[in-house]
Amino acid sequence: MPKYDAVVIGAGNGGLAAACRMALAGKKTLLVERHNLPGGCASSFRRGRFEFETALHELCEWGTPENSGNCRNTVVEEYGVPLKGCIVPENFRVITTASDGKTHIDAVLPCGVEAFTDRMEELVPGCRKSIEDFFAIGKECLDAGNYSLSVNGKTDSKYMMEHFPNFLKVGSYSVNKVFKALKMPALAQDIMNTYWGYLAIDADRLSYLQYSNMVNLYVRHGAWIPDKTSHELTTGMLERFRAMGGDAWFDCTAEQILFDDNKAVCGVQTNRGVIETKHVLCNGNPSMVYATMVPPEVIPERMIKLANARKHCARMFVVYLGLDKSAEELGLTDYSIFMQDSADSVKEYNSGKTLETNNNMVSVCYNAVNKNFSPPGTCVLSLTTLYMEDAWADVKEEDYVATKNRIARRMIDKFEKTLGVEITPYIEEIEVATPWTMCRFVNTPQGSAYGYELDDWDSMMARMRMMGTENQVKGLKFVGAASIRGDGYNSAIFSGSTMAKLTLADMKKEEEG
């Protein structure tokens, strides 16, 4: 029976980050993955002469060597993963109707705090002070988060009150409540709320801290994409893990997590046999793991209640298009465009609960930033929408293909109508992924690759402050989208690194007796 200091289940962003952190610390670590490639959602696939990015729109918290974000620091500087990529020059373009139901919005917002603020003032005269206050508070919140990390969450209350008073003031409020407190004009709020779909919860409930952190990181560091899709990122982490002495088994399914008489982890049962270990870092959804991989008697009642109280987050539907015209020929100059019927996030969230009413969409043209993303004279375009409920559960198997093709056609039509650009005649390759696809490939409940909703009671701040109670099964910790910081590549990587550090701390305590 092979024995390891730690076993990491699942080679998604969180699992790979955890595996690298453990190997970097010199621990004998095994990574097991049921597929034949790493990445989970962070991957790519080929159709014809096109290679499609599976999930990444743009990576947050990355930046450049001169303006590096924490995610880049972890992956490149600490883990030593050599990566080349492109900075996305604008944060986003948004095309929608304002929450007043009348005003048309079509705006491009640049990177950089000063440029972003100037552009907002051009779009909404008189909003400058509220935007400046937003970024000032955002900087304070980022600094507070970095301080918390530097002391492993053991913050000093007096120090927090002296140095981060606004962080404490806004910590328990939603995005919309803080925007109103900042006296931000309604139209400015509509534009500033554009990114809500990246966290998939409406701004009435979305934690201001979570949203502020994300927007500030995008604006301050810029968004980034790897040259060769997410597959380059995840295979790069895998190669570094192996170079640091780690073992990786692919086509290997973890079937059960094993426990001793003290209800502590003692091993993992796989389709290749049993692996002995005292520590498991699981890149999976706790609801699925508790239901299928862990004996019920070892799970504390609180963890069952917590998993049941949480709501599965957005379920992805993506149309992948390989076009036989270049982005320049088609006039596709914007990298990322948010196309919403309304800037009212509550209305859009509720519309996203059914197949028929969901009309929210984000387009990404990778060639607008990376000219070599596809063969010369071509471009790759993705259209993504999110379902806020398990709407696909009611689709009959015999209706599946027709349903997904009908929705894909509706999304293509919306793109063409909104931008006044015809793409249908130039579609060389098309693939459609539904929540069922996500269920199959990454084994997430309802196809929810975003983990659990970051609701007001279950926000990033709440999870971070309660880290000690999030992992009550001895020897088992969760990483990835369903972990402490929610969805997003950077958040998954952060969770993997953080949970690995906590595991290393547990190991040290065990060694010290």
Each predicted region: which residue ranges?
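A conserved FAD-binding loop/helix module that cradles the flavin
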Residues: L56, A481-T503
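Rossmann-like flavin
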Residues: S99-L206
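A glycine-rich dinucleotide-binding beta-alpha-beta segment and adjacent secondary-structure elements
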Residues: P185, Q189-D202, N358-V364, V421-R485
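Active-site-proximal substrate-binding core of FAD-dependent oxidoreductases
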Residues: F259, A505-G513
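C-terminal segments that line or cap access tunnels to active or ligand-binding sites in enzymes
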Residues: S326-W436
